[in-house]
Amino acid sequence: LAAVSVDCSEYPKPTCTMEYRPLCGSDNKTYGNKCNFCNAVVESNGTLTLSHFGKC
């Protein structure tokens, strides 16, 4: 099984769009899109990872 990952190098960003493309984080929380997820990754100091694409 290939590891899924998202490039968060351009984050954090001050604002995210309302686009809905859900991602499931390793904290078992569904993030609305990559921007919301990546901002959370940055805030977690890299401890948050992507579990899978789609809702948890």
Curated annotation (Swiss-Prot):
One of its GO terms (cellular component) is extracellular space. Residues 6-56 form the Kazal-like domain. It holds the Pfam family Kazal_1. CDD domains: KAZAL_FS (cd00104). The keyword Repeat applies. InterPro entries: Bifunctional_prot_inhibitor, Kazal_dom, Kazal_dom_sf, Prot_inh_Kazal-m. One of its GO terms (molecular function) is serine-type endopeptidase inhibitor activity. The record marks 18-19 as: Reactive bond 3. Glycans are attached at residue 45. Disulfide bonds join 8-38, 16-35, 24-56. It is found in: Secreted. Avian ovomucoid consists of three homologous, tandem Kazal family inhibitory domains. PANTHER family: OVOMUCOID-LIKE-RELATED, SERINE PEPTIDASE INHIBITOR, KAZAL TYPE 2, TANDEM DUPLICATE 1-RELATED. This is Ovomucoid. It comes from Lophura bulweri.
